[in-house]
Structure formats: structure tokens, C-alpha cells
Amino acid sequence: NNFNLCELGPRSTGKSYIYEQISPNSILVAGGQTTVANLFYNMSNHTVGLVGMWDCVAFDEVAGIKFKDKDGIQIMKGYMASGAFSRGKAEIQAKASMVFVGNINQSVDTLLKTSSLFDPFPPEMGTDTAFLDRMHCYIPGWEIPKYRPDSFTNDYGFITDYLSEFMRELRKDSYSDLMDKYFRLGNNLNQRDTIAVRKMISGFTKLLYPDGEVTKEELREIVEISLELRRRVKEQLKKIGGMEFYDVNFSYTDNDSFEEHYVSVPEQGGGKLIPEGMCNPGQIYTVSQGKSGMLGVFRLESQMLPGNGKFKRTGIGSDRDAKKIHKYSFQLLESKWKPYQWFYNYYNERLYY
């Protein structure tokens, strides 16, 4: 039941405070600097490190995360995937979840245009797709309001020690199969995506409906937010790793109506491949196979401007096959234009593609 979470956002939203104060079973590693011996296993005195002593290990200020050992990140990747690590001759199991919190110093729009939402991480982690793919969830810290005096309630609440111990006891249970009664996940989710989403469904259900009694619509809301949080990770992996992570169109299907619902992330814009309504003049969408043989959606744009009758191609780069197809298509059109009177008036104009 290990869980790997990332939350990056503006300052003063309580990111560090939660992991430092809300539970006696979590520890906040300030500054991010640590060693393999401190975090995992000390070979000299044969003692397990922080992951064996705490339920949650949170790294504050991800930009400063640094291992003094060269193999630190590799060991962390293995632990994040399986909840186990090897030191010496032994393989050691631990139950601590990994949390990474930090600040974003630019707007989300700027990050999406210039780099990725994992940009605050050090380069050896923020560009390592194997490490980032092990992140189950990315909480959008920019959507969380900053704390102010009126953010706190005057009503009664649980003492944090009681609440944390109650939630700790619930770790023994799993609600990840509750969704199977009403929904099933789409085929764009691979095994790692499915594990991440099911972990989140179980966690949200424990927080909101700890008795496990949840209606279909209540569960639908949990499924959608879980898909969004995992898709945010996958969208950034696609930016960093390219088409290896092409399958980002996360969805779920209603078992009663068989209707498939797609879930997008707000900062990426619309969740539909083709926008609703009429296309702009000169635009058309089509489905075709790319060079790899994979089906994809393509948008073709054309524009006619006064010219000298020559054919000019733009926007297709150095793709030789695409150039050849455009050339042959125009030659065919040029050879067949005479029977069509409507084309006569346009012949002395330049076509841009």
C-alpha cells in the first residue's frame, strides 16, 4: 500500500505543514538532502532507515533533493515501484509512502509552454521518465488557495492524533475494487496507470466514506478526480518522453449504459480531440495512420492567396513522403482542371498547405 505523490504549487498553501503536523507517523525531510543509509538501510550497523520507521516520508523543497550516493535515485525508483529495495544480500520490504512537495516560481501556462510541470525537480529526477512514471499522483497546488485567518473553522474537529491513527488503521483495508460494480477503466490505461488510479480510489473512499458505503454518483466523482490526477503525470511524461507515452486519453465506461467518459486535465485545455461546432474555413480533420502505423487524428489547413500559379508547401517540415504526396496531388489536379470551369478562376492563385 505504498503511494507516491507529488504536489507543486505556490507558497503558503500548507504543503509542508500537513506532513509535519497532521500525523505523528510522517516525517518531513527539510532541504531534501539525504543519504541511502539514512533513507533506506545503513550497512555499517544493519538498521533500516526512514522508510522502515515511518508511514510517510515527505521531501520538502524538491529542487534541493540530492543524494550523496550515486545509486540513491536508482534505489528510490525501485522502492517506489515495488515497496522493496536490496542492500547487500537482503531484500527489505517497507511501507512508507513517498511525497514530494515544492514551490513553482512561474505560472503554470509558462511551464507548460517552455518545459514541464516537473521542472522544479533537479534535472536527474525531473527529466527521468522512469522515475516520474512511478509517481501515482500529481496534486495541482496552484488550485489550492493560500491560507488566511478565515480559512480555519470554529466548529469541532478531530484531534490530529486520533484522525491519523484512525486513517492508519484503515491502511489494512482496500476499497480499490468498489468501482468494478459500476465502472471499468478505459484501454488507454496501462498496468501502472491502473494501479495508481485504484490506489487513489481506495484512498479517497477512506477519507470521504470510511465505512465503504458509497453511491454510484459519489464513486463517479472519485473515479474522475483519480483519473485526472494520474493523467497529469502522464501528460508531462508525454512531453518529456515523446510518443512512448502517447496513451493519455484516460476514460472510464459506465457498466449500465456502456457510455465511455473521457477525463482531461484543466490546464491542458479542452479534453476533446476535435472541437465542437464548425471548423474554420480551410480546415479539415481526418484519421489516418502515421509512419509507425499507429492511428492518429490529423488537422489539415489550406489557405489561398494571390500568387503566380506555383504550388508551395509549408508546415510539413522535411518529411519526404508528405512532400511527394502533395506534389503528385497538385500535378493530378493541374492535369484535370480543364473540364471544371470553376477551377479556371483560381488557377493563377497560389495554394498554401
Give a label for each model feature.
Residues 45-48, 81-96, 111, 119-128:
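Conserved Walker
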Residues 150-151, 177-252, 256-258, 262-277, ...:
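C-terminal helical "lid" subdomain and adjoining coupling/linker elements of P-loop NTPases
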Residues 53-79, 93-96, 103-114, 130-131:
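Conserved AAA+/SF3 P-loop NTPase catalytic/coupling segment centered on the Walker-B
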Residues 49-53, 85-103, 133, 345-349:
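AAA+/SF3 P-loop NTPase mechanochemical coupling elements
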Residues 17-58, 62-69:
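AAA+/P-loop NTPase substrate/partner-engagement loops
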Residues 112-146:
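A short helix-turn-beta junction within AAA+ P-loop NTPase domains corresponding to the substrate/partner-engaging
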Residues 1-27:
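P-loop NTPase catalytic core of nucleic-acid-dependent motor ATPases
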Residues 263-353:
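Conserved P-loop NTPase/AAA+ ATPase motor core
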